[in-house]
Amino acid sequence: MPQSMTNAFWHNFLGHTPNWYKKTILGFLVINIVLSQVSPFLAGWALIIEFIFTLAMALKCYPLQPGGLLAIQAVLLGLTSADSVYHEVLANFKVILLLMFMVAGIYFMKDMLLFVFTKILLGIRSKLLLSLLFSFVAAVLSAFLDALTVTAVLIAVAVGFYAVYHRFASGSGHGNDHDHSADDNVHDLHREDLDTFRSFLRSLIMHGAVGTALGGVATLVGEPQNLLIAEIAGWNFIEFYLVMAPISVPALIGGLLTCAILEKTGICGYGAKLPDSVRQILVDFDKKETAKRGFGDKAQLLVQAVVAVVLVFALALHLAEVGLIGLLIIVLLTAFNGITDEHRIGHAFEEALPFTALLVVFFAVVAVIHDQHLFTPVIDYVLAMEQGAQAPMFFVANGVLSMISDNVFVATVYINEVKAAFDAGTISREHFDVLAVAINAGTNLPSVATPNGQAAFLFLLTSALAPLIRLSYGKMVIMALPYTIVLGAVGLGSVILFY
């Protein structure tokens, strides 16, 4: 209990986070004031490093609060403006719509997803085959849907599996309220199996998450920056696929081979198998659910399955923006499954809205990068090189910058600079196409290195699943490292060989 008002304010500041973390954030705020007076450029780079720190410490404190304080200070210090932040948010409004509605739509589909994936998980005993399936299916889906949507599905499935076993391990009855984020009631007998199960889920989720990048690089609709680059280059769906195939196909093969090697060797946190005791619990759960499933439950599953088909076709044919399709899914699922209570509907939005707010804070950091021209020296350096070396260097530069910033922003900056060079007659149309391919590959493949680069990875890191399976920023970086090396090497090699 705080003994004074000063102690009370300190206790309330960032809540239950450790004192060293609170002092670090305050230190950042003080340092930024000094740096902004010396060099706004340096202050901008300091802000990027500080924001990455808040992401890395996501399990200590949700990054929205410390990151938000840093973003507010950046505006107050003049490193960017409220108008610039608004412009960045507006430019990414499609992503915000997606998070608001599509993730909530997936929430209302979780019974069907858990049903399908339970059958898959229990039907395939080989962890290697299961991992390859997760990675390949995620890649195929991401090529036609959206990486965030696919990640939301993976998260919903993993949370469902985890909750089933955690309830059993805690001795909680099926009908009772249960907090699967608390381990206080987990019996000692089940703790080892629970830890192994966490490791099992971590590896599957990371294989699936990287799979979204493998598929995302291949098609026009795979990632938001693909659409942007294709629009400027004038490529349609088929042209985009064909021009990217010399990179995307080897990357997919390399990614799947990496998946297999990781599961065979067990390095970097992979290789954990589903414990027999956990499998039995899931088998029993599936039998109980099947036995008690009445006509009402079956009707709900059927509705969810039909709406899932509608979702796939609507996204693949791009009938509307992804977020609006998400709203369509919410309306269809709640209307035909009788979910009309406002509080029940509200639960669906709990997962995505904190992350949506965090993403807006991230866009404030992107606004600082833009206004302070933090990436300009790198761009100028690459464009000053001889043409033969530009494509590989564009791939490397885009890859490195996408590891610390949003890959959509990096792609936007680079493709606009290249377009300006083409319009000025500095480069030919053929060379412009080569650089556009290098930019697209560079922002898609190496950006799996950290959660900063891809919105889907950042969403996974800050989701309700991450603390359950002990998936921290550092753990994600370590688990992504083999993929980063392979995809970076394959991508760079393909750019050099084929372009």
From Swiss-Prot:
The keyword Zinc does not apply. GO terms for molecular function: sodium:proton antiporter activity. The keyword Ion transport applies. Coiled coil: none annotated. Keywords: Antiport, Cell inner membrane, Cell membrane, Ion transport, Membrane, Sodium, Sodium transport, Transmembrane, Transmembrane helix, Transport. It catalyses: 2 Na(+)(in) + 3 H(+)(out) = 2 Na(+)(out) + 3 H(+)(in). It holds the Pfam family NhaB. One of its GO terms (cellular component) is plasma membrane. The chain crosses the membrane at residues 38-58, 62-82, 89-109, 128-148, 149-169, 204-224, 242-262, 310-330, 349-369, 393-413, 449-469, 478-498. It is found in: Cell inner membrane. It is a multi-pass membrane protein. Belongs to the NhaB Na(+)/H(+) (TC 2.A.34) antiporter family. Na(+)/H(+) antiporter that extrudes sodium in exchange for external protons. NCBIfam families: PRK09547.1. This is Na(+)/H(+) antiporter NhaB. It comes from Saccharophagus degradans (strain 2-40 / ATCC 43961 / DSM 17024).
